């Protein structure tokens, strides 16, 4: 067993070396586009750009974190944030009895007709989004009886730092977390979605919001995405999703993933230095006090 684990880790290490080289080349080609990311006019453009900056930075502790086992070179360029791709989602029409939804689907979901399906299916089936990379392996993992694969894809998305969570291009307040048949941070960490976890984020959200109502000072310190909506087919980890809706009051905000703070800029500075210069008049001490407060 130990030899098998070592062989798996060696394979992961080889993948990490290969992917690191590809991502380094992507950084050399595209980094200048991100040098003025804080000047982008829309909050979502700033967020997705900072996510992309963070994607070029290796994990601080896990030596082979760069490996996305299950992504070949083509898939990496099509679906990883380092390459800033844009793609459409695939869709399944599942029998209503086979799919559990935590709430009504978002209004911007595509129609059955748009997906090339008969409109009459709307009464008997419900749509479930699928990542294009997972789409290719669906039969291998199984589908509920009566499931129909939509002939057309729909909804343009861009990958965030987490890779399996994507931002809806035309509705950037909406992010969708999707299962991916890819392993990261170890051969056993397959990036699927356990159905029971669909409800964890919403529970945490409502708990924090309840605390905020009791403590106004606490409530002024954070905003929380709405994670009420999600769906899953029975206990199938490859047939699930979580929809996250960002608050509407983000128009002038700049959201900064912590993972992006130490990202290098083309001019040699760290991103946190640019951030401090823009919002704290260059005072790292003031920024640090705010960050730790």
Please describe what each predicted stretch is.
Residues 89, 96-291:
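Conserved ATP-binding subdomain of kinase catalytic cores across diverse folds
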Residues 1-129:
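Noncatalytic N-terminal accessory/assembly modules of large enzymes
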């Amino acid at each position: 067993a130990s030899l098998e684990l070592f062989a798996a880790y060696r394979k992961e290490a080889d993948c990490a070396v290969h992917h690191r080289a590809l991502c380094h080349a992507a950084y050399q080609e595209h980094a200048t586009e991100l040098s003025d990311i804080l000047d982008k006019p829309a909050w979502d453009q700033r967020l997705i750009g900072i996510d992309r900056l963070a994607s070029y930075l290796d994990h601080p502790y896990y030596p082979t974190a760069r490996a996305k086992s299950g992504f070949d070179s083509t898939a990496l360029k099509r679906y990883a944030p380092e390459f800033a791709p844009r793609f459409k989602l695939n869709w399944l029409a599942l029998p209503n009895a086979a799919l559990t939804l935590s709430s009504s689907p978002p209004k911007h979901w595509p129609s059955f007709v748009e997906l090339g399906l008969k409109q009459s299916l709307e009464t008997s089936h419900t749509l479930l989004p699928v990542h294009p990379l997972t789409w290719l392996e669906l039969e291998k993992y199984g589908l509920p009886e009566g499931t129909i694969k939509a002939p057309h894809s729909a909804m343009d998305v861009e990958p965030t730092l987490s890779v399996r969570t994507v931002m809806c291009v035309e509705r950037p307040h909406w992010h969708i977390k999707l299962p991916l048949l890819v392993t990261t941070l170890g051969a056993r960490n397959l990036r699927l979605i356990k159905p029971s976890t669909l409800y964890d984020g919403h529970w945490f959200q409502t708990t924090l919001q309840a605390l905020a109502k009791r403590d106004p000072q606490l409530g002024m310190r954070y905003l929380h995405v709405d994670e009420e909506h999600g769906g899953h087919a029975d206990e199938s980890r490859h047939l699930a999703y979580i929809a996250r809706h960002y608050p509407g009051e983000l128009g002038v905000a700049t959201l900064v993933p912590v993972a992006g703070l130490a990202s290098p800029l083309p001019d040699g500075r760290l991103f946190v230095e640019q951030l401090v210069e823009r919002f704290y008049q260059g005072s790292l001490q003031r920024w640090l006090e705010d960050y730790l407060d």
